[in-house]
Amino acid sequence: MVKLASQSGASAIKFQMHVLDDEMLRKTPKSKNFSESLYDALNRTNLSIKQHIYLKKYCKQNNIDYLCTPFSRKSADILFNEVKVNIFKIGSGELTNLPLQIHIAKKKLPTIISTGMSTFREVKETFDQVYKINKKIALTQCTSIYPCPSKYSDIGVIKDYIKKFKIPIGLSDHTNSIYTSLGAIALGACIIEKHFTLNKKAKGPDHASSIEPAELKQLVE
């Protein structure tokens, strides 16, 4: 998938790092679309530190940047100190997690912050706290529905973010096509994040909200 993403023209590919006991309880309630608890699902699919280091090296060999989302201060430290990540991506669920946001900001790396499930006041509060520590940040508009109908993407917010924050603004797009992303670019978005799969019909929680290699290539072109 790394090679295909690179061949399709993507600038970067993003992974996740979980240190489960540092970020959630073992008895986290089970989601309706999961057959197991979130803890068990992530424990089964989680990548090791060695795998992350290998993936970063493999990305470099294939001319695509390695990005990663930490979900706790410990995973952020591992990414910074051991994996040697060059950029952080913080997911929407951690937007109001100011201890984590500030901890990452102090590392002074370029950081992309998603803003799903949040009010404008919450976005501004996090921006104010982070920007005074690290000015190398970007925000992405996001609607946390998987897959997300285009009518709920609210890409008009992109223009508001550009006007208010005067930093790079993008879209974390969970629709199952490329057209919402194209609209976001027309509104000034300079970052587009899409879930990526080899088969939209595959089993799993994310495939239906993803695009395949041919679509990614079309989006980039």
Q: What do these predicted regions represent?
A:
Residues 1-221:
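Catalytic cores and adjacent flexible loops of soluble metabolic enzymes
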